[in-house]
Amino acid sequence: MKLFDHAPLSLAWREFLQSEFKKPYFLEIEKRYLEALKSPKTIFPKSSNLFHALNLTPPSAVKIILLGQDPYHSTYLKKEQELPVAMGLSFSVEKNAPIPPSLKNIFKELHANLGVPVSCCGDLSAWAKRGMLLLNAILSVEKNQAASHKYIGWEAFSDQILMRLFKTTAPLIVVLLGKVAQKKIVLIPKNKHIIITAPHPSPLSRGFLGSGVFTSVQKAYREVYRKDFDFSL
């Protein structure tokens, strides 16, 4: 597919999702995304990071899913060069980017719950490599335009990713932060997976700090895997 020339996807995920790529909805996603890339508009994350969440966490390695909404649409300056904050993982940012308010709150709650030191780096790649799928429901965005790529149809694809994981892998720990993410509960088979919900970590939302969400995640992880998840960065 032409899409994978711009946005590499690992063999493990290509095999896991192979029947999706020929379906009309996905061909339409490919068409719309490639048209967006060709336009004068700036698209985040860079195309090489479009499937970064999948490439860092193979389907067989997924233990936790932390679902996000869509990529950060902002930029930061590095040596006078404007760079995207988004890097293809939900809530995560490029290594040298300023830490956004939502991620700051995630780090605060993680420290309060489990004593994990507050990181000065917002790159969550280490979590992904340990089995946490950091998937956004919408995989791309136009610079400075939040939710601008909802029209592309990514949610149909991310829903299929989730449903296939829910069918083939058990049990998973599914962390849904905020009302938008919690709409995905309908996709999750009952009594098969562990669902953990909390308010969105955005400062505009109330109730995330003090929710104990990471205490719940760690408790569930211990029950399933008989060890702690390593949240260090």
Swiss-Prot record:
Q: Which GO terms describe its cellular component?
A: cytoplasm
SUPFAM superfamilies assigned: Uracil-DNA glycosylase-like (SSF52141)
Report the principal subcellular site.
cytoplasm
Q: Where are the transmembrane segments?
A: none
Originating gene? ung
Q: List the disulfide bonds.
A: none
| Keywords, alphabetical | Cytoplasm, DNA damage, DNA repair, Hydrolase
Q: Do the record's keywords include Flavoprotein?
A: no
Q: What is this protein called?
A: Uracil-DNA glycosylase
Q: What is its EC number?
A: 3.2.2.27
Query: What does the function comment of this entry state?
Result: Excises uracil residues from the DNA which can arise as a result of misincorporation of dUMP residues by DNA polymerase or due to deamination of cytosine.
Q: Would the keyword Ribonucleoprotein turn up in this protein's UniProt record?
A: no
Q: Where in the cell is it found?
A: Cytoplasm
Q: Which GO terms describe its biological process?
A: base-excision repair, AP site formation via deaminated base removal
